[in-house]
Amino acid sequence: HFSLDSECHPYIEKMIQTSGISHSEIEMEFDRLLMKEDYINPVRYLSTGHIHPSIENGEVIAPFYEDLTPQIIEKCMKSMIFYHKVLLAPGKTKRKLLFGGMKLIGAYDGMHGMVMSLEPNPQCRDYCRLLKRLFAGAVPLAAGLIIQYQKKLFQGGELPSRFHRTFGAGEKWEELRL
């Protein structure tokens, strides 16, 4: 996940600034592309099947986050599933309610991309192709980072600078070509 996001987010930031399309809509369109390639209906698919809320899983995750308890982690996992279910809207009525509520509270522009659209946004077609190429490159990158991390763990020394990137846009995203 770190490899993919740290590779893609600078480009996504450039896409946002170039097109005005929100981060969530660009990622939603990329999710659609990946699901369609696997013959999954993106409008009906609940993508939280891999999340298993429990105190035991919370105990595994909590040490990675300062000030979070296993109970808070479990609650977060339950909330993630709940909100994904809220935003899963294959039917007209629920879609109208969701989008109407978003407009009512002034959050439509930032949030509508969290609900899978019925049809792809044609403005995102080329962006998704670029993200697919970056996705393909992130897999070997992740494998290499894992090896570098293990080497650091077992042999000491400094982490390579690649580990200092964040999930954000980073530096020089403005110079990227789409």
Language model segments and positions:
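Long, contiguous binding/interaction regions
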Residues: H1
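N-terminal leader/auxiliary helical segments
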Residues: D5-L178
